[in-house]
Design a protein with these regions (language model features):
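FIC/Doc superfamily catalytic core
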Residues: 1-192
Length: 192
């Protein structure tokens, strides 16, 4: 838990459990985002892959056999009816996503772009494991890229972790957006 992680840092204990390493990995990835992601910075596929590698580093249960590499087979998403695209299509979809978030649009669309990118990444599900953690980090990075002040007052954890407060509702809203309709995507955008 977060409390255990904070205790381990304060008391100088070794981070010897998967759960503590998972929180430490997320903290490291957030530090990385805060170093590289400034307003207007380009987001690259390499950055996303690096976030994945950091997130799953040295994890047993929640790790990935190929940190930082796109998946090489089919995956299923727990608690979802969505079947992600074939792994052969992942590279092209990820390039399309990166092109979309880096496109020079009016700032009035920035929050909508964050919402759409969050959904699209989840829809693609590019990695074998760790996609949920990476999409929340990606969302954090995009908020910084678009100039939203998300680190005021210090941070304890990723502000996009609020998506986990009601996972059932989160998954239901993702499923609504999965239909690809204007109405479904608008409902998702309003939710985010």
């Amino acid at each position: 838990t977060l409390a255990d992680y904070i205790d381990s840092k304060v008391e100088g204990k070794a981070q010897d459990t998967d759960q503590l390493r998972e929180v430490a990995n997320i903290e490291k990835a957030m530090d990385y985002i805060e170093q590289i992601m400034t307003p207007g910075a380009l987001l690259t596929e390499q950055t996303i892959r690096e976030l994945h590698a950091m997130t799953v580093h040295d994890l047993v249960r929640e790790g990935d056999k190929t940190p930082g590499a796109y998946r090489s087979g089919a995956v299923r998403i727990s608690q979802s009816d969505h079947l992600p695209p074939d792994f052969i299509q992942v590279q092209a979809y990820m390039q399309e996503l990166v092109d979309f978030v880096n496109r020079d649009d009016s700032p009035k669309y920035d929050l909508m772009k964050v919402a759409l990118a969050h959904h699209r990444f989840g829809w693609i599900h590019p990695f074998g494991n760790g996609n949920g953690r990476v999409v929340r980090l990606l969302t954090y990075a995009l908020l910084m890229k678009y100039g939203f002040n998300v680190s005021t007052g210090g941070r304890v954890l990723n502000p996009t972790a609020v998506f986990c407060n009601d996972r059932e509702h989160y998954y239901a809203m993702l499923a609504t957006a999965d239909h690809g309709t204007t109405v479904g995507l608008e409902e998702w955008g309003t939710y985010v």
